Amino acid sequence: MKRTFQPKNRQRKREHGFRARMASAGGRKVLANRRKKGRKSISA
């Protein structure tokens, strides 16, 4: 059985990146919550 995590930078950015988060209301909420919590990094 192959491992489930096969890292790809393009896929990572497209699915979890800042612009992907900003594209939907839910994603913007995620960023707001991470900013409020004081996360060092707010998106991939």
UniProtKB/Swiss-Prot annotation:
Pfam families: Ribosomal_L34. It comes from the Bacteria. One of its GO terms (molecular function) is structural constituent of ribosome. One of its GO terms (biological process) is translation. GO terms for cellular component: ribonucleoprotein complex; ribosome. Residues 1-44 are annotated as: Disordered. Gene3D superfamilies: 1.10.287.3980. InterPro entries: Ribosomal_bL34, Ribosomal_bL34_CS. Keywords: Ribonucleoprotein, Ribosomal protein. Residues 1-16, 31-44 have a biased composition (Basic residues). Belongs to the bacterial ribosomal protein bL34 family. HAMAP family: Ribosomal_bL34 (MF_00391). This is Large ribosomal subunit protein bL34. It comes from Syntrophomonas wolfei subsp. wolfei (strain DSM 2245B / Goettingen).
